[in-house]
Amino acid sequence: MTQLINPSKFTNTVGLLRSFFLDKGFLEVHTQNRLSILAACEDPFNVAIYNYAGQVWPLPQTGQMWLEHELLSQPDSKGFFCVSTSYRQEPNAIPGRHDIIFPMFEFEMPGSVDDLKAMEYELCEYLGFGNITEKTYAEWQQHFGLSADTEMEAEHELAMEKEFGQTLITNFPELTSPFWNMALSLIHI
């Protein structure tokens, strides 16, 4: 079930995130009032709906598509970010891992995947996280003794955090159902 969030921690965390991106010239986008079926693109099997102004809409799961819309509308921008509420009607929510309603901070920026990774590392350093252990999905599978066609589960993610602290997973294979807009690597096809 969804837990109450400590207002002091929320204020401090969102303040740090806002400061980081505003200092880089990003603009904040209010996405929560935009009605769209695209706001429910994370997992179609846990979409909740509501009736508003005589039409049925999905409760938003992400502001990603609106951030991408702004980025495409203003390609010379530094980037965009939003703070929104995500609604995920998880049928098998894992306590401590899944909240069915939670605040989410997202950003989009122009550039390559290497630019994105550099930004993520810089953000983690700014927020005070320690060293980050980075491995490809295949390397993490090998670490846990999983075959290449076996998807990692929540238990593996928890073990990563316990053993390594902060981690980064790259190069997600097709078996993990990556987002439809992610680049496809033809290396292993």
Tell me what each language-model feature is:
Residues K117-L186:
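Metal-assisted phosphate- and nucleotidyl-transfer catalytic regions
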Residues L4-S8, N12, W57, E108-D114, ...:
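Generic amphipathic alpha-helical segments used as scaffolds and interaction surfaces in large
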Residues M1-P110:
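Class II aminoacyl-tRNA synthetase-like tRNA-binding/catalytic domains
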Residues P60, V113, T170:
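Short beta-strand segments
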